[in-house]
């Protein structure tokens, strides 16, 4: 009889696990349906013309950034700003040749080489952007994926430096410069690139009771912790972007911003690129990558649509032609607490090292 009781208990436990436990785990850490949908999605650029507009792309030499630049160039963009740590001169020549061969007009292509591993590189880009007449679209595609821990000149683990801190700082510095041209019917858009990698990393995003949350995530070790750094850095960026969007909404109401601005995130989906190449040597990342991968050109089109969205996309995550929800852990009360903590710790770091960002924070202090 005792064995029958044990058998019944085990059977019940297994049934509960299959019915509730595994689906809950997948929803939290591996929503495979999203990957599957993106793998088979084939978005195309919905905006027919960018005539008169100015577009700035970071990570412009990357697989997504370079393809996005070409998509804009073939749609009559007026000024195309290519930002990367590597010289984008060759990309500029490729674009101009493609347009010449197609009998299309060439845009004004500006090549800004900047090392965004340093905050000074972000400041340099922002200073140059002050000379732009308009700034209709900012697409932040810069990013790194590293399975070996390194430290930036600013003292942060490099994934967190590039994927989060430098992108966030540059976004803040460019925010007051966003302005639509007369032929653009929508408010200017700033889009930060997010990633499915946030989900499997969510289990490692717990906050410490004491000390700096950002430092805890940055002071990681090689191995499994480093393997999650890409996802964790993207989670930080998504938290920041949501908070920034909320604050921009508040200051727009009070007219502290001269015009409406759309802040959103875009998920391009996954593709085999030089960025994701390190996954080839990692079994689980390689299997996940293979399950969801599609052509880089399709991913770039999704990003172009994201940064071309109307004001209805403010504060949302764009995915192909639609929006998608925030990860479950971000929607809980603890997620909103983490968001505020990240915002304040990031502010402390920036204001200590980048004096001009203080004015932007003061403008956003309305909530």
Regions found by a protein language model. Name each.
Residues 56, 234, 262-275, 279, ...:
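C-terminal, well-structured subdomains that either form a transmembrane helix-short loop-helix hairpin
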